[in-house]
Amino acid sequence: KVVGKKNSVVAMGAMGYITGIPVFCDSGFVVLSPISRALAQQSNTSLAVMATALSGGLYATHCLVPPTPGPIAMAGTLGADLGLTILVGLLVSIPAVIVAIIWAKKVSSTIHIEANSEYTLEELQKKYGKLPGTLQSFAPILLPIILIGIASVVSILGATGAVANIFTFLGKPVVALLIGVFLAIGMIPKQEKKNTLSWVSAGITDSAAILAITGAGGAFGQILKALPIQASIQGLSTTGLGIFVPFIIACIFKLSMGASTVAMITTASIMVPLMETMGFASPLGRVLVVMAIGAGSMVASHANDSYFWVVSQFSDMKTEEAYKAQTGMTAAMGITIILILFVVSLFV
């Protein structure tokens, strides 16, 4: 409604941007791909265009904005203020989404893929029945972010007293996110209540993997501290590369291992002892390092990344087409962000 049917590519990017904040990009793409397909068919646009815009929107906030597991783990590891990390992440990810939309229109538009949607947009709306209103739909996402933001402001101002303590408690990430979960559960239609337990079980299963990765990343960081490689990395920190150091390290892990979350957590663990040496010990400096690692973890989504195959398979792309659309786009997004961060770091 806001952007209109003519700007449906922008709508897909914006939809991905919002959905990627609390949801893994892989899961978000699977859930939203029927809408992408239906919009592509309705607007007579190549499915590759819609898929690229959606993928980029999801990827930007997945890599940069807590409470997605990777960014929130980085913020905790590096001691970055969570509220400030969310605010900066939301702002920095906007240029990344714009890059994704431009890439979709200029590059992915050369890839012709028929949408062949099983449902029209109207049929999808009818299939899901009456859905919650706009405010209700956004509440489980926005309320935790607002609570975390208020807690950060209280901390910065050094406020004390009962009210300050209440907001500090409610703004703790675990508490704020739990409130969001309860809000979401409260909006489940009666006929779907029977599925609640299976959804919770699936969520616990997914989070267990993240906890294991976080723990392994921390342990790996401690191992690296005891190895000669740490001295090499510290030497790299004195080369004047500044904000590019965490970006480069994250790129190496991303390209070699494929998983953005693993690249983020591992790089954050390596960067901990280098923060003061590199001059990133200030609150904003720590957040910039989180953003730089997030940008590096974007470069680039290719064949060893599960997200690459999710996007290609659910968008009917051939492998070479996915390299052109997905890999090229994610590389452009990450490079754009690090250049922006470099300019900002000159004034911090």
Locations of the language-model features?
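Re-entrant/interfacial helical elements at transmembrane boundaries that shape
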Residues: 1, 27-39, 68-78, 115, ...
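Short amphipathic alpha-helical coupling elements at transmembrane boundaries
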Residues: 1-4, 34-42, 126, 198-206, ...
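Hydrophobic alpha-helical transmembrane segments of multi-pass integral membrane proteins
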Residues: 2-35, 211-217, 238-278, 294
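Transmembrane alpha-helical segments of multi-pass membrane transport proteins and ion-pumping complexes
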Residues: 5, 9, 17, 21, ...
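Alpha-helical transmembrane segments of multi-pass membrane proteins
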Residues: 5-20, 43-63, 81-90, 94, ...
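Transmembrane helical segments that form the transport core of multi-pass membrane transport proteins
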Residues: 147-257, 261
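Long, contiguous bundles of hydrophobic transmembrane helices that form the permeation core
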Residues: 87-199, 315
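Juxtamembrane and boundary regions of transmembrane helices in multi-pass small-molecule transporters
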Residues: 43-45, 80-129, 295-348
